[in-house]
Every structure is written in C-alpha cells, then in structure tokens.
C-alpha cells in the first residue's frame, strides 16, 4: 500500500503565486460587473453616515506617489467604516481650473492670442476632462472603491453655480471687497497669488546699505544727518516714499569721520562692523517716536521720504530704519496708508519697471538691481554692497521668484469672523494633534485673502460695474449668474455682454444709460476647491455637511483645509469638517525629495505593473504616514516578502480546510482542547488590536499585528505542530476537527481584517472559504472578538508555555548544530524546569511531544537536579538526545513501536491504527 496516499495533505485551488499585475485587473472587472460601489452602498443603506470628503487632486498628468498615498489611506478608512456599522460613501473629486492647464495648452502649441477667451477656455475644459479620465483609471487600478461614475469636478456647471452662491453669501455679509493692496505677484504667471501658492527656495540677492540725507529735522535733528536703510530688493527703491522707525526703540546719531548717521542703538556694533567704521562715536540718542514726521531726501529722485512709526520694525537684522515702499510690501502699505502716502507701484504685470521709475523703465525688476545700485554709488548714497543667499518666496507652479506688488484686487476679509474661525479650529479633532496649532496660528496671523486672479481659466468673479464705476453685487445678480452658470457653464460669462448676463430689465442708479461692464478677473482656485462643502457635501443627497473627515497632505493646512474653513465659517458659521487627518510627503529610499534632476522618481504605475496594487497598498499601511515616508525598490521588496507570508498563510489555511464543512464539522468551543482555545484567545486579541488600530487610523499597527500573527502565532507555533494532526490522523479525528474549527475562524477573521488594505487578495480568498454565501467579502462586517470565559487563565498558562518552548527550541538548535540530531523529530528531550514551569507542564493534557515537535518527551526533576552538562536556559535545563527506535514511514516520528503491527511493518502503532480504521476495507 502507498502510505503517502493515506496522508491528508493540504489541497486547494487557491494559487500560491499572487501574480497581482494580471489577477488584479480581472478582479476589478468582476467588481465593475457587480457594481461593487453601489452594491456596498445599498448593503449599508440606513446605517449612520460616515463621510470622508475627498480633497480634489489637480487634473494634470499621471498620478504620483503622493496621490497614491493619499487615495489609498482614504480607501482604508472608507472600506473599514463600511464594515463596522456605517454607510461610508466616497465621492472622488477633481480640481480643474488654474494656470497649469493654461500652461499645458500653451506648451502643446495652442496659439492663445489667436482666439477668444471663450474659445481658449473650451480647450482648457477639454484638456481638463482628458486629465480627469487619465487619473480616474489610475486611481481605479489602485483598487480604490469610489463613486467613479459620479465624481465632483470643479468645472462642472452645477459646481460653479454653488461656488457663485458662496461668493454671493460672503459678499452679502460684507466679507468681499475690492482694494489696492500689495499682493504676492508672479511676473512669470502674470497674476496675483494667494499664500497657498507660494513656496520658499534659496535665492541670491544683493544686500545694500543706503544713506538717505535728512531734509527737515523738525527741531529733533540738526539736518546734516543721514538715515541708513538696509534692503535686499534694490529694485524697490524707485518706489520708496518713506522710512519706518519703531516708536519704542532708541536711535543713535553716530559720528563717523565727517558724517552723521542714524541707526537703532542696539544695532550699533553690528552695523559698525558691517560698514567697517573706525572711530565711530555716538553723539546723541533719541527715541524712535521723536523722529516721527522728520523728512529725508530720496537718494536719486527729487522727492521726500517721510519718517513714520511702525511696529513692524525689528532689530533682527538691518539698521532699525526700514525702507518703506507702500506699493511693494504689506507692512509698508499699512504704515503708508496711516500717513496718507500714495501707493506707488512702478512695476507692470510682467515685472517690468514703468515710466514711474525714470531712468530704469523697461527693465525687468531683477535686472534693475545692478543699474539702481550703480546709481546709488554715483550719487554717494551706497554705503555697502554684498550678496547673500536667503529664503525667498517663489511661484509654486513656475518655480520663479515672486514680488510684492500693489494692484487692484478682490479680497475676502476674514477679520469679521476670525474669532469664529479660531473657535472652529478648536472644535475640530486634529490628527496629528500639532495640526491644530498649525492651522490656529495661520488663521490668527493671516491677512485678507486675495481671491482674484488675472487669468482666463477659472470661475469668473460675478461682479458688474455701473457707468460711474460702482461695483454691483446683489442677491438678484448673484442668483441670476448662478442660474446661468448652472444652465450654460461659466463660459457664458465670456460669451455674452454684461447686459445679457444681468437679469431682464435690471437697472442701477449708477448707470443712467443702462450701460454695464463685467469683471474680467477670475477666482483663486483655492476658492473653487474651498467651496466643495457647499457644492458637494451640502448638495448631494448621499453626503452631509460637516464631513466626518478631511484627509490630505500636510501642505493643505495652508491650502484646502484653510480655504474650506474660511468659506464654510463665513457662510455657515461652522467648520466643514469634524476631523482633519494629514500625511507627509513621499521621499526616496535615502530620504530625498523626488525630482527629475536626481532621477529618483518612483511612479505608482510602475509598481502596479511590476508588483501589483495590493503591494503598493501594503506599503502604505506599513509606513508612519503622519511624517514624511520613504519608498524604494528595497523597501518594496521587504513589503512584497510580507505579502508573500500573508498569502501563504491564507493558502495553508484553505488547503487544510478542503474537507471541512462548517455546518457539520465545527467543534463547540467548550469541547476544544486548551491549546486550540488559546489560539482563539490569540485570534480575539488580534481582532481587538486591529480594529482599535483602524479606529485610530494607525495602519502600521494593523500591518505589524497581522504580520506578527501570521509568522509568530500561526507559522512558528500553531500551524507547525498542527500538521502532525491535520495530515496524519483520520479525517474525522476529534483533534483534527478541533484544529480545523480554529483554522476556519482564523481564516474568516483574517480575510476580513485585511480587506481594507488588501481588497484584491481578500476578495480572491473569499470564494474559496467553505460555507460563505456573500458575493464579496466587502459585503460583510469586521469580525467580532469573542471573549472566552477562561481567556485570562489560558493566556497566563500558555504564554508561559510559549516562553518555555523558546528555551526548548534553542536547545534543539544547539543539538542540530552539534550534529546530535538531524531534525527535531529525531530528538528525545528531557526537561528539568523551574518549579513554576514544572507545575504548568504537568497541567497540560495535550501531547507535549507533539507541541514540541519531537519524538519523545520526558519530564526530569527540577532544574537543580539536571545533569551538570545539561544546557540551562531561563526556565528549564534541556537534555537533547537521539530518540530510540526507528522512523515511521508515514509520520516520520522515531518510535520503538515500528512493526508492532505485522500488517504494517514500517509504521508506528498510531499510524497503523489510523490506516486500518480509515483506509483498509
């Protein structure tokens, strides 16, 4: 007889190799056929809502690792929530207006100047939709479950109409105004920028010290002194109209040879060293407040420079006398306004100096630095020129430096509701907790929000102007424009004359002739996405405002988290979110930012094509995403290894449940052996731990808990010794069915627990599980931890056994290395444990040689009675010897009972019995 045919070896069709790049698209087709998103929504209908609101990625180009990290994290949460008693809709969105799309078309050769604005905008819309389609397919490939057929897209008419309503609401409350103010201006984009659109990079700049001669000392100064200012922007000097000093600072009049200079007293030593003064002496000191209204002369123009008081003056750098150009700085503007100075801004949209800067007109601002410095030298006003490298604001899109420039812009003032904004921040749950401080400080310190842009591709600012120049924003005009946009899209603004955009028969006292103009500026894209709480959460029946969670990269504190909060509090008085979670950026394996120049860009598509979406998702779960995270081939290799371990565990469990029918073969918990119940306790601990980790968005804890359970609790212990029972005993042996009962519970629970992270794999495993009826594991709930009555006692006893077992394994390893035995089944072990461990071993009813995977087990005396040469460990001394007897052909145990049964000469007594009872007719 072929004894190998009497072994119940694992049997399953579930493939060993994942082959995810091929298998996942097939699984996604199956999901599409069963309308998985709608099916899950239907299945969870009537449950409490959990709304994670998608911050819209910008529709331009392929998705990058930051997108993948973001969307996968969101998917973990939404999938988990739908398996724990919630209805968790997920509506993806796209941000589709703005400069990058205009630039992309220009780069493709679109001749913008040869077409109308409306025609150009149509091309922008087409391009944006193409990008949405491209990204949608890539997000789907990641396995993200979403309402892909009904996303929100910021260029869609219904969305734009709601955005107009938000603007109108804010205007009605007095939060929207037009004013001339210095704003961040990008000469390369030819548009104003919001704070969220700037990034800081190092830039080399001229650092100059300039003397301004006193013209009128107002009886405080004698008139022969000179104020010294310091600046790193010489190009702004043609716009200088004043000098600011701090009212509380003490200023020194310093005599250097025949000159007298005015600087802040506490900066005397620093300035003296920088300007290489020798024999400098302070001849007089005055308080800053006394210098108010003294007048200096502009160094190269025939005009005055008024000395004013400003709290913005510091002694961190410079001289304590600050060059003030109201057209080129926020503080300068505020101080200048207070003193009635004009707002002079001799720089045009392209960053070129105008005729208001005589002698330098036609020069690009950065190119004007040199001739202006030369002019200062020529008139004897330049005291020092050096070059410094400092952090300077740049346009986040063009990566070129920006300037402060006063222009007429539309602003949203947050002053009137700053207190409510700060209260809303305090009421929100922030993860990580430092997010609260970060946004609080931003809101506390931020100025008015410049919401206008001088571009073509965006939502128009819905303002009309009367003949006398009065801006017109009324409920009537706002509602009418919103209706027009809802019906025709915002392009109608560029296709029709102002009068055709106004309500029928509209009149205004400022337009006696019935003539009107329309605003040509568009809204900042942050106003677009920042209106999504109104356009999406409030408008869609399947969602609600406030959302439970906003989850984006940490750059969104100044972006979407901020703009959404501002518009929501302005319109509703409340935050649009209950909770905010932020993640870091994706770096390469060495912790460097990814860039084309370094050539270290990792692309999601490549990972999915080579390894699969579930490997990328498993990587996301493995990292501490709240900080910056790393990815590389080596890191992915480690993750793929963990995936292999998890997959092999599933395969082993399925293979050993091939003949198990849950309805017939399940053993009641009370009838299970202790070691089996101990495994259930470990499983329940895992369920509790994993669910708690999901609840707190700690996905790395989920990853480690599942990996450890598969490798330590299952592979290294339970599954290892169980093979001797599963393969060797008869199919219906009580111990075998007991183990299968445990394996079944483990398999079902484990499949559900990994579903949010590995949905493709979980749904691949699911139909192989005996007795399941649901079409997809996604239509089930997370497993519940079942508390066994004797759980604590089991844990205490069997945890102790596991520590003792570790000692035994060490001893077997030593014996193997010393060639005492070949494999552990060749061994006979005698233990000399501590008193505590001896009592524990004596209380175990299970076959201990099976648990230790040896052929013979003996309990000697106490530890102190062990032979002198016996290796001693923490809990026991262990004597390892070669087991006596022969090796059974069927179970490989070394036994002295081989051949006792004459019919089965090569089998041990146990195997002979099993064969006779189950296989001999």
UniProtKB/Swiss-Prot annotation:
InterPro entries hit by this protein: aa-tRNA-synth_I_CS, aa-tRNA-synth_Ia, Anticodon_Ile_BEm, Ile-tRNA-ligase, Ile-tRNA-ligase_type1, Ile-tRNA_ligase, M/V/L/I-tRNA-synth_anticd-bd, Rossmann-like_a/b/a_fold
UniProt subcellular location: Cytoplasm
GO biological process, any: isoleucyl-tRNA aminoacylation
Keywords: Aminoacyl-tRNA synthetase, ATP-binding, Cytoplasm, Ligase, Metal-binding, Nucleotide-binding, Protein biosynthesis, Zinc
One Pfam family matching this protein: tRNA-synt_1
Listed EC numbers: 6.1.1.5
Binding positions (L-isoleucyl-5'-AMP): 552
SUPFAM superfamilies in UniProt: Anticodon-binding domain of a subclass of class I aminoacyl-tRNA synthetases, Nucleotidylyl transferase, ValRS/IleRS/LeuRS editing domain
Ranges spanned by the short sequence motif 'HIGH' region, renumbered to the chain: 57-67
Cofactor: Zn(2+)
Ligand binding (Zn(2+)): 888, 891, 908, 911
The record's free-text note on cofactor binding: Binds 1 zinc ion per subunit.
Alphabetical list of CDD domains matching this protein: Anticodon_Ia_Ile_BEm, IleRS_core
GO CC list: cytosol
Main localization (coarse): cytoplasm
Catalysed conversion reaction: tRNA(Ile) + L-isoleucine + ATP = L-isoleucyl-tRNA(Ile) + AMP + diphosphate
Signal peptide annotation: none
UniProt-annotated binding residues for ATP: 596
GO MF annotation terms: aminoacyl-tRNA deacylase activity; ATP binding; isoleucine-tRNA ligase activity; tRNA binding; zinc ion binding
Biological function: Catalyzes the attachment of isoleucine to tRNA(Ile). As IleRS can inadvertently accommodate and process structurally similar amino acids such as valine, to avoid such errors it has two additional distinct tRNA(Ile)-dependent editing activities. One activity is designated as 'pretransfer' editing and involves the hydrolysis of activated Val-AMP. The other activity is designated 'posttransfer' editing and involves deacylation of mischarged Val-tRNA(Ile).
Family classification: Belongs to the class-I aminoacyl-tRNA synthetase family. IleS type 1 subfamily.
HAMAP family: Ile_tRNA_synth_type1
Quaternary structure (record): Monomer.
Name this polypeptide is given: Isoleucine--tRNA ligase 1
Species of the source: Bacillus anthracis
Gene: ileS1
């Amino acid at each position: 007889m072929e004894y190998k045919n009497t072994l119940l070896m694992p049997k399953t069709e579930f493939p060993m190799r994942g082959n995810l790049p091929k298998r996942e698209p097939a699984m996604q087709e199956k999901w599409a056929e069963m309308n998985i998103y709608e099916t899950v929504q239907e299945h969870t209908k009537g449950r409490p809502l959990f709304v994670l609101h998608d911050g819209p990625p910008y529709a331009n180009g392929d998705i990058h690792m930051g997108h993948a990290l973001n969307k996968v994290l969101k998917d973990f949460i939404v999938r988990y929530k739908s398996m724990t008693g919630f209805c968790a809709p997920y509506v993806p969105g796209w941000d589709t207006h703005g400069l990058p799309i205009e630039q992309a078309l220009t780069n493709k050769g679109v001749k913008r100047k040869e077409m109308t604005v409306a025609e150009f905008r149509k091309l922008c819309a087409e391009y944006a939709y193409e990008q949405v389609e491209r990204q949608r397919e890539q997000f789907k490939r990641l396995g993200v479950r979403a309402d892909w057929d009904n996303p929100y897209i910021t260029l869609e008419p219904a969305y734009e109409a709601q955005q107009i309503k938000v603007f109108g609401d804010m205007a009605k409350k007095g939060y929207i105004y037009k004013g001339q103010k210095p704003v961040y201006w990008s000469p390369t984009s030819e548009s104003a920028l919001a704070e969220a659109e700037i990034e800081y990079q190092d830039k080399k700049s001229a650092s100059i010290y300039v003397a301004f001669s006193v013209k009128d000392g107002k009886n405080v100064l004698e008139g022969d002194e000179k104020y010294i200012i310091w600046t790193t922007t010489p190009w702004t000097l043609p716009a200088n109209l004043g000098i600011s000093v701090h009212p509380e600072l003490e200023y020194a009049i310093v005599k250097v040879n025949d000159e007298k200079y005015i600087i802040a007293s506490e900066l005397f030593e620093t300035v003296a060293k920088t300007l290489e003064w020798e024999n400098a002496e302070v001849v007089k000191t005055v308080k800053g407040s006394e210098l108010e209204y003294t007048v200096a002369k502009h160094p190269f123009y025939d005009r005055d420079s008024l000395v004013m008081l400003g709290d913005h003056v510091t002694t961190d750098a410079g001289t304590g006398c600050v060059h003030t150009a109201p057209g080129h700085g926020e503080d300068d503007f505020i101080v200048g306004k207070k003193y009635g100075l004009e707002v002079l801004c001799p720089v045009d949209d392209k960053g070129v100096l105008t005729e208001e800067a005589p002698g330098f007109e036609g020069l690009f601002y950065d190119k004007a630095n040199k001739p202006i410095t030369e002019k200062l030298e020529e008139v004897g006003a330049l005291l020092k020129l050096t070059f410094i490298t400092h952090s300077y604001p740049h346009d986040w899109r063009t990566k070129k430096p920006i300037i402060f420039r006063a222009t007429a812009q539309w602003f949203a003032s947050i002053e009137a509701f700053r207190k409510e904004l700060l209260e809303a921040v305090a009421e929100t749950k922030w993860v990580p907790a430092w997010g609260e401080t970060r946004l609080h400080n931003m809101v506390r310190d931020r100025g008015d929000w410049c919401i206008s842009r001088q571009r073509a591709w965006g939502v128009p600012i819905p303002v009309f102007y009367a003949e006398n120049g009065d801006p017109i924003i009324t409920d009537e005009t706002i509602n009418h424009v919103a209706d027009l946009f809802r019906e025709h899209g915002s392009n109608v603004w560029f296709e029709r004359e102002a009068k055709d955009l106004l309500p029928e028969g509209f009149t205004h006292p400022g337009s006696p002739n019935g003539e009107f103009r329309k605003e040509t500026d568009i809204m900042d894209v942050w106003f677009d996405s920042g209106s999504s709480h109104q356009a999406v959460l409030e408008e869609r029946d399947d969602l609600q405002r406030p959302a439970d969670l906003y989850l984006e990269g940490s750059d969104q504190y100044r972006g979407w988290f901020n703009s959404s909060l501002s518009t929501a509090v302005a319109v509703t008085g409340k935050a649009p979110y209950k909770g905010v979670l932020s993640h870091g950026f994706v770096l390469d394996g060495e912790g460097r930012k990814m860039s084309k120049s370094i050539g270290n860009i990792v692309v999601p598509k490549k990972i999915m094509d080579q390894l699969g979406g579930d490997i990328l998702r498993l990587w996301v779960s493995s990292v501490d995403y709240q900080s910056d995270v790393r990815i590389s081939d080596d890191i992915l290799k480690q993750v793929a290894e963990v995936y292999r371990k998890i997959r092999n565990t599933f395969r082993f469990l399925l293979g050993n449940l091939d003949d198990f029918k849950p309805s017939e073969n399940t053993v009641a918990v009370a009838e299970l052996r202790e070691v089996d119940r101990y495994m259930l306790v470990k499983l329940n601990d895992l369920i509790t731990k994993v669910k708690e980790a999901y609840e707190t968005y700690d996905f790395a804890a989920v990853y480690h808990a599942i990996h450890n359970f598969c490798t330590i609790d299952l592979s290294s212990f339970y599954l290892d010794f169980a093979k001797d029972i599963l393969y060797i005993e008869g199919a219906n042996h009580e111990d075998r069915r007991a183990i299968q009962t445990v394996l079944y519970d483990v398999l079902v629970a484990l499949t559900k627990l990994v579903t949010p992270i590995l949905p493709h794999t979980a749904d691949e495993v699911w139909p192989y599980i005996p007795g399941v009826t649901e079409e997809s594991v996604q239509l089930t709930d997370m497993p519940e931890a079942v508390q066994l009555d004797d759980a604590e006692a089991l844990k205490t006893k069997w945890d102790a056994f596991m520590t003792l077992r570790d000692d035994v394994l060490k001893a077997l390893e030593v014996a193997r290395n010393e060639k005492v035995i070949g494999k552990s089944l060749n061994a006979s072990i005698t233990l000399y444990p501590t008193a505590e461990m001896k009592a524990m071993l004596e209380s175990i009813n299970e076959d201990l040689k099976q648990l230790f995977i040896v052929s013979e087990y003996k309990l000697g005396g106490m530890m102190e009675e062990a032979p002198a040469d016996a290796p001693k460990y923490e809990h026991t001394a262990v004597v390892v010897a070669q087991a006596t007897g022969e090796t059974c052909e069927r179970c490989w145990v070394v036994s002295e009972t081989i051949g006792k049964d004459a019919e089965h000469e090569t089998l041990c007594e146990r195997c002979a019995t099993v064969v006779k009872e189950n296989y001999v007719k």
